[in-house]
Regions:
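Charged, low-complexity surface segments at secondary-structure and domain boundaries
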Residues: 1-3, 21, 218
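N-terminal secretory signal peptides that target proteins for export/translocation
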Residues: 1-11
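Generic detector of low-complexity/intrinsically disordered segments
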Residues: 5, 29-30
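Catalytic-site microenvironment of enzymes
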Residues: 14
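An N-terminal assembly and electron-transfer interface module characteristic of large anaerobic redox
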Residues: 38-543
Length: 543
């Protein structure tokens, strides 16, 4: 700590020296250490971007900040990408190989290129031979453009805790046997790591009988295929065929098949330098982090980031859907994005404030207690944020007291303090790791943008994370529950058009009540990308 108390100029020089040393030992990806505040957008740089699926967060929202900085982001048509069903990997490969020569960098989803998308990676029927051919094809991207850096990201197959928790994104049998599969895989993980008690051994026998062998063999067979593919991708990172490979533990748990596979892959990758391979909880945020990394490398920039937590458990919290502390996830996120953590907020290009629940137990955006009632922890965190903003820091907030939506009490406090559009980044969607990675990645790019562009990017998050996920979605889902159809949340079917109109109207009302007047908001449109309530798409006319 004392090393950073000697003054602004000394600290910048000292941290820059540390960053250069880190580059030399392989902690950062070969970029010059320079503050993001001094960086100039490299207009004309081109990034080839293959998203993991066609969701707005995966596609246009991940690319938006880089585009506003003046980079050309080449993206395939959405029709080639997967959603709930597999995309068109053959067409995607033709597109990528035709455009790769134009790119200075490539950020690519291995799940899209190998399986046809994130969800398809969990449900595919591809043979080992087909998978091997597609994995080898990824190596050829570098051969087609040797000067281009390739930043790749993929996933370990997730292990949802139950059928309902899977959201219908697993094979159909998971709805019936999901809870038993999850528990059985957790016991096998524990058996492999430390052994089972007598009671656990008996439970494992019972679960083995409870899950039909054809179901278990299908699920495990697919996992084994994907495991082999990930081993090969890690080897590409080892050899430099991939400049960076990030592997996500999607919807993970401390005892699960995902956790056991990650432990074995970590052992296999022990000799790969951290600058080239990272494995951590999450997946949906990786495109944002790696696009930020590509921009940082192309502009020869190493952003300095100070991380602060709400009072209480703070960085020691292990979020829902994760098997590691949020502090460890953020440490990895910084490395992935090519940033350096600094202990003094006054010396940072970006201050990342993480709104953790004081007791470490997350709620959910659609729970009844997320009613906006003032809470001490939310009010004090808003005051905490105001102190940094008023001191001149450029602040991004990762709102992770809840999964799948913003903390209404915090958002009301930020609104009442007129802080919403004094920030440089915000995220409060899906899992904690998704929100942290997105707020960090977009925040470190937003600090280089004009205020009007930052406001437009913040608007997307406030309308989606706060407006839709924590308020309108909850209200409309309750109304849909009055219908006789019980599965409308996961499949809107004949109710989609009417529901879309209802959500659009309520979102416009929400914006009018909670956000300052902004161009186009009163004419925003809403749609359901996957024809289900969980995921929304919001379009605000530019003019």
């Amino acid at each position: 700590m004392c090393l950073f108390q000697g003054g602004h100029r000394f600290v910048k020089i000292f941290v820059a020296v540390i960053a250069v040393v880190a580059i030399e030992i392989g902690m950062l990806g070969g970029v010059e250490a320079r503050s993001a505040k001094d960086a100039k957008p490299a207009h004309g740089g081109t990034i080839l971007f293959v998203p993991q699926d066609d969701r707005p967060t995966s596609y246009e929202q991940s690319a938006a900040a880089a585009q506003k900085l003046g980079y050309t982001v080449l993206m395939p048509p959405k029709t080639m990408l997967g959603g709930l069903e597999a995309g068109e990997p053959d067409a995607l490969w033709q597109w990528a190989e035709a455009r790769v020569g134009e790119a200075d960098a490539a950020v690519v989803s291995t799940d899209s290129l190998i399986y046809g998308g994130l969800v398809a990676s969990r449900k595919h029927e591809l043979s080992e031979e087909e998978l091997a051919e597609r994995v080898d094809r990824i190596a050829r991207l570098k051969q087609l453009n040797p000067k281009m850096k390739v930043y790749a990201f993929g996933s370990l197959m997730r292990t949802p805790a139950s059928g309902p928790a899977s959201g219908g994104e697993e094979p159909d049998y998971y709805m019936t046997y999901g809870a038993q599969i999850f528990r059985r895989s957790g016991l096998l993980d524990k058996k492999d790591a430390s052994g089972l008690s007598y009671g656990e051994q008996q439970e494992l026998v019972s679960l083995t009988d409870a899950v039909p062998s054809e179901v278990w063999n299908d699920w495990m067979g697919r996992r084994e295929k994907n495991f082999v593919a990930n081993e090969q991708l890690i080897d590409f990172a080892r050899k430099g065929t991939l400049d960076v490979f990030v592997l996500g533990k999607d919807d993970n748990a401390p005892l699960s098949a995902t956790h056991m596979e990650s432990r074995k892959l970590a052992e296999a990758a022990a000799d790969v330098r951290p600058a080239h391979f990272q494995m951590l909880a999450g997946i949906d945020e990786f495109s944002m982090l790696l696009l930020a990394r590509a921009v940082n490398d192309l502009s020869h920039t190493v952003p300095f980031v100070n991380v602060q937590y709400n009072w209480g458990v703070g960085g020691a919290m292990v979020p829902d859907y994760s098997d590691e502390t949020i502090a460890d996830s953020i440490k990895s996120d910084l490395l992935i994005a090519g940033a350096v953590a600094v202990p003094d907020a006054a010396k940072a290009d970006l201050v990342l404030l993480v709104n953790t629940p004081p007791d470490g137990h997350m709620g959910c955006g659609n729970w009844a207690d997320n009613d906006g009632t003032d809470r001490y922890d939310a009010a004090s965190f808003a005051q905490f944020a105001q102190g940094f903003v008023d001191a001149g820091s450029r602040v991004a907030i990762a709102d992770i007291t809840r999964t799948n939506g913003s903390d209404n009490a915090l958002m009301n406090a930020l609104r009442d303090r007129a802080l919403l559009f004094r920030l440089y980044g915000y995220a409060g969607w899906n899992t904690a790791t998704n929100s942290v990675g997105f707020a960090l990645g977009q925040g470190m790019l937003n600090v280089r943008l004009p205020d009007a562009d930052v406001d437009r990017l913040l608007l997307d998050r406030y309308l989606d994370d706060w407006g839709y996920q924590s308020n309108v979605r909850t209200q409309v889902t309750e109304q849909l529950s009055w219908l006789k159809d019980t599965n409308t949340y996961l499949n809107l079917g004949r109710y989609e058009a009417a529901t879309q109109l209802r959500v659009t109207r309520l979102l416009r009302q929400f914006a009018a009540q909670n956000l300052p007047p902004m161009p186009g908001v009163d004419h925003l449109d809403f749609y359901f990308p996957w024809h289900r309530m969980f995921i929304g798409g919001i379009v605000v006319p530019e003019k």
